[in-house]
Regions:
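Acidic, polar low-complexity linker/tail segments
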Residues: 2-62, 69-76, 88-89
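Von Willebrand factor
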Residues: 54-117, 122-162
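Surface-exposed acidic, glycine-flexible loop patches that form ligand/cofactor-binding
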Residues: 44, 50-55, 92-95, 154-162
Length: 163
């Protein structure tokens, strides 16, 4: 993390190359059928969000998604529209300095993959990584967003906090 910036043209290219549409189903957008090991906390030591010459004052932002069956409509909205809108708004309003986003997917306690976390990114890679997440699409009422909080508290190294 720490290099590049996000642009509307990057989003347009990604959306076109993946044929993304808000009329698609969760399974059409999130095509993985198992958790990618690079997003599985079991295989992640630390996620870093460091300042760089290009981004000297990074502001970490985590977008957490409930990936249980009942929330599929929201994941589609985030993947096809809302993430792009959020990032464009952050850049156009300069609401925060040097935004670096991480996407996280959390499900039920008993899921195969109750938590997945991307890298912190400041460019189109965040949208690409979001689309690589596994949407488990189950649900038994034991959603665990607290596993995300635990991960963030123990497995991140963030300059904005360390300063």
């Amino acid at each position: 993390m720490g290099y590049g910036s996000y642009s509307a043209s990057d989003w347009s290219r990604l959306k076109s190359s993946r044929n993304l549409s808000d009329t698609q189903s969760v399974d059409e957008i999130f095509q993985r059928r198992a958790c990618n090991p690079k997003f599985d906390p079991k295989f992640i030591g630390t996620r870093e969000c460091f300042d760089s010459e290009e981004h000297p004052n990074t502001t970490p932002i985590v977008v957490g998604l409930d990936v249980t069956a009942s929330m599929g409509y929201l994941a589609v909205e985030v993947a096809t529209k809302a993430l792009n809108q959020l990032i464009m708004k952050l850049y156009s309003t300069a609401a925060v300095e040097d935004p670096a986003l991480m996407c996280a997917a959390y499900g039920d306690f008993g899921d195969f993959s109750p938590l997945q976390v991307t890298q912190f990114e400041s460019d189109i890679r965040i949208a690409e990584q979001l689309l690589e997440l596994y949407f488990e699409n189950h649900g038994c009422g034991e959603v665990v967003p607290t596993c995300l909080w635990e991960f963030l508290s123990k497995h991140t190294n963030i300059d904005a906090i360390n300063k």
